From Swiss-Prot:
The gene is PPDK2. InterPro entries: ATP_grasp_subdomain_1, PEP-util_enz_mobile_dom, PEP_util_AS, PEP_util_C, PEP_util_CS, Phosphohistidine_dom_sf, PPDK_AMP/ATP-bd, Pyruvate_phosphate_dikinase. The lineage of its organism: Eukaryota, Viridiplantae, Streptophyta, Embryophyta, Tracheophyta. It is an enzyme of class 2 (transferase). This is Pyruvate, phosphate dikinase 2. It comes from the Eukaryota. The active site is at H469, C847. GO terms for cellular component: cytoplasm. The keyword Nucleotide-binding applies. It is found in: Cytoplasm.
Amino acid sequence: MAPAAHRDGAAEAVGQRVFHFGKGRSDGNKTMKDLLGGKGANLAEMASIGLSVPPGFTVSTEACQQYQAQKAMPAGLWDEILAALTWVEGNMGAVLGDPRRPLLLSVRSGAAVSMPGMMDTVLNLGLNDHVVAGLAHRSGERFAYDSYRRFLDMFGNVVMDIPHSLFEEKIEAMKAALGLRNDTELTARDLKELVAQYKNVYVEAKGEEFPSDPKKQLHLSVLAVFNSWDSARAKKYRSINQITGLKGTAVNVQCMVFGNMGDTSGTGVLFTRNPSTGERKLYGEFLVNAQGEDVVAGIRTPQDLDTMKDCMPEPYAELVENCKILESHYKEMMDIEFTVQENRLWMLQCRTGKRTGKGAVKIAVDMVNEGLIDRRSAIKMVEPRHLDQLLHPQFESPSSYGDKVIATGLPASPGAAVGQIVFTADDAEAWHAQGKSVILVRTETSPEDVGGMNAAAGILTARGGMTSHAAVVARGWGKCCVAGCSGIRVNDAEKVVLVADKVLCEGEWLSLNGSTGEVILGKLPLSPPALSGDLGEFMSWVDEVKKLKVKANADTPADALTARNNGAEGIGLCRTEHMFFSSDERIKAMRQMIMAETIEHRQIALDRLLPYQRLDFEGIFRAMDGLPVTIRLLDPPLHEFLPEGNVEDMVRLLSSGNVYTQEEILTRIEKLSEVNPMLGFRGCRLGISYPELTAMQARAIFEAAISMTEQGVKVFPEIMVPLIGTPQELAQQVDVIREVAEKVFANAETTISYKIGSMIEVPRAALIADEIAALAEFFSFGTNDLTQMTFGYSRDDVGKFLPTYLSKGILQNDPFEVFDQKGVGELVKVAVERGRKARPDLEVGICGEHGGEPSSVAFFAKVGLNYVSCSPFRVPIARLAAAQVML
């Protein structure tokens, strides 16, 4: 017998590899996900709180880890599995392989982190020609042979690696020959014939017979689940979702209960709340006379869960009660799989339900208002990526496209998507890599499609319901999906989709409304969403908890306004160079300045640029009224402002004003060309070589600040000098800026408060931060350049080798996306420590791309930064990450 249920299973489970569970008793509990996987831990938990769970056992993730290391069944494990099997047989009064009292098993995977459709499942294990005859005697021939043919298909595909399509061809051919549409119309005699054909597939595909010994079937199935951990699709899913550090998958072996025993049986999947909208109402699907995989795999399009009320009222009432118990117990929205066998309800699985961004925020806010959780728990419940989804665009005018709707499916994952039609996952990835937006159109998706699904802007399937593979994966990613669109027929071979009287080809534009299920012909305009309602309330809780300020990188008044609307507490980086590209007049003046050989000529060009800069700064100060604005002086190499193309084209363009001869221009271009421009003539080196450039920018800032102050706008300008490597560089630029300030203030007969600070992006600057802090009133880490110079990776060329580094495990993440805490992070720690030793009130922030990446934000909060600055659209994500690090 298994040990009785206990709540501290982890402490007593040292060395244990096989864990039992059944109603009212279990070896494990919900805290043991690392060891039992999410599925196994939750089965143990459901059993121990008294829900009807078919008895079974879980083989631990550590056993999988041992198998991966040895590439063989670990010593003694098979004996432990057989002992657990004997316990299950005793509980059920049935025996694996006994025709008189047949026990059938399911074998499922389950890692610590849910990976929908990534791992392999085998149902009805234990059937062979003898056992099926005994099962037929007890439960009817049709049920028995339907179970047998399903098992042959699944076992062949999952364990023996026989393509599912070979089995599908046989059943489709039989239905066509008999003039039938549905599998359920096949008779017992038809199914017997199909079983014979399926067994022949084994011989044709593998050159060997189907293994009829049930214990051999179990042995092979356990190994197949272990092997599925390293399958290409599982690796790809983990890579896309940045899932690392797991030991492997657990194996859950459970006695089968049957939803395909007639009209008093069925199977379903539900969420305790709507995962798309968060509405507090059971949301799910149900199939009468079916097995669980039929719902999840999208093989049959199921009915709404509400239909169960009428056909199975008692199991439905028990199910509703179980959902209340589970939500109250886990304090979470739960995803539940269940089966009804001859009017008896069985709970097969529960896990925390995947949800959209909209659903996540509403569920969190509602659960606080219901008194189920507190605000801090609500903040932990919403993931940064959920906010990313909520900030996705919607259609500008949903009412205007009514006449363009060509089909309607199920609204499987909300949001809007616009793209060109592709029919394969590979094409979706290839087109996406070329910068194209695509809609992946499939009859149904499978786990092999995850790469293409991730690359696509949206997904459209002809078959499958709200809990099909496509729907679950798309919702997890916040990707728009319309599923079960029966009005379309997909022809993969011809690369066309038929919709009513229309034939749509690869490359045609399609728009999807994942909130309504509408499929719209053509390319509709999209508009950004807003922070309001539940999201506004949730973000106010976030701001109560976080200590780290969140600013935005914004170069235009429009960007600044977006940042402010998204809750930014200032501008942490305004890149002045972007302003020079916004009109032909500006870029011409900039090129005139670059081509100038004398201070006088350069000053003429700078005088032309001054009003443009001043105007832009005024707009940004106005948008950020009352909040600080950090302006970085010119940073990029000057050659970036020259026309693109070959030298002859450049010369022709630059000489069109007849100011310089072609020879003079050619000489100047040659002088500006650099072998390694990112480490060359840029940043403060420009301002030191051309002090008049720094002077013009400082003057524009101060004049704009005074102008706005006179109009009643509260202005807090902060001037940031880029690429500082020595205190002498900063001292020279500070002198220029202060001299300009005095002149502007004298002319205007007024003064304003301002700060001068330094970018810390050269590793040397981090190491001598105490010397730089003597002159700088604030630091801002430019983590893009700091990463580039610390690793010695050119950001422009890293794509040539980074994919290899990631695939070989040399790097775990792209260091330009996820901040390197160990190496570059050490420089940040040193700079903060030394800088504050010299200037205790030193304000320190970061303004690289890492400012909006959640794990990076958590690190910056821990090392004592005052703020992070990120793109305007990532501000809410950074705010949430900054709050979560405090919990």
